[in-house]
Design a protein with these regions (language model features):
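Active-site-proximal loop/turn and secondary-structure-junction residues that shape catalytic pockets
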Residues: 23-25, 75-78, 126-128, 154, ...
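Alpha-helix N-cap and loop-to-helix initiation/capping positions
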Residues: 50, 81-92, 128-135, 157-161, ...
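Residue-level detector of conserved catalytic or cofactor/ligand-binding positions
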Residues: 186-193
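Charged helix-capping and loop-helix junction motifs
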Residues: 3, 137, 162-167
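Non-catalytic, usually N-terminal nucleic-acid engagement modules in DNA/RNA processing proteins
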Residues: 1-114
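Hydrophobic faces of well-ordered beta-strands that scaffold small-molecule active sites
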Residues: 17-20, 70-72, 120-124, 148-150, ...
Length: 193
């Protein structure tokens, strides 16, 4: 895709394109992954290969795709989760975000970058714990990114919790930046018979 000029040229689409970091995809491979400070080690469900993905790798992949918006690499925690694990995950996600920002700035400054104006969005996490969610949004907002997403929703929690979290966190998202609500429609749609 990089050799073809990035996603915009490859697809013939001149509008905005957002690429995900791989965090949700890693979440979906729960039985095949190991999360560490440096990133995530997982096993391919296709051929059994061992693969590593960290913040820098995620940013390099998204930079090569040349999307308009790149999402920061984060850990999406399945609900319900224990408070202590959710807290540690939030802290790690902020550290990963700092690494994403540094790598994105480096990549955007390189000659030959597909999209040197690529935007970076941070992702709010904290499971169903309002205080973790609010603190996490304050921490990621302090990094002065291009936009902010509320992520880690519709991953097992009741809809009432999802709506409560959105209401609790939204006031802490910077009003002068783009806001993005990330939802897995697979988990919130009602089954039809």
């Amino acid at each position: 895709v990089r050799e073809m000029g990035g996603l915009h040229k490859f697809s013939g689409w001149s509008g905005p394109i957002l690429t995900d970091s791989g965090g949700f995809q890693v979440f979906s491979l729960a039985s095949l992954r190991k999360i560490k400070e440096e990133g995530v080690y997982f096993q391919s469900h296709v051929d059994g290969r061992h693969i590593f993905m960290g913040p820098e790798e995620s940013m390099r992949i998204q930079s090569n795709l040349g999307s308009t918006i790149a999402m920061a690499f984060d850990e999406c925690v399945e609900n319900p989760a224990k408070y202590e694990y959710a807290k540690k995950s939030c802290e790690r996600t902020v550290r990963w975000l700092e690494r994403c920002k540094a790598e994105m700035q480096r990549l955007n400054s390189l000659p030959g970058t597909v999209n040197p104006h690529q935007l970076l969005f941070g992702i709010n996490q904290g499971c169903t714990f309002d205080e973790l969610r609010i603190e996490n949004m304050k921490q990621i907002s302090a990094l002065d990114l291009d936009g902010y997403a509320i992520g880690g929703l519709a991953v097992g929690e009741p809809k009432e919790d999802m709506y409560r979290i959105i209401s609790a966190v939204e006031p802490y998202a910077p009003a002068d930046k783009i806001r993005y609500l990330m939802l897995s429609l697979i988990h919130i749609s009602e089954p039809t018979r």
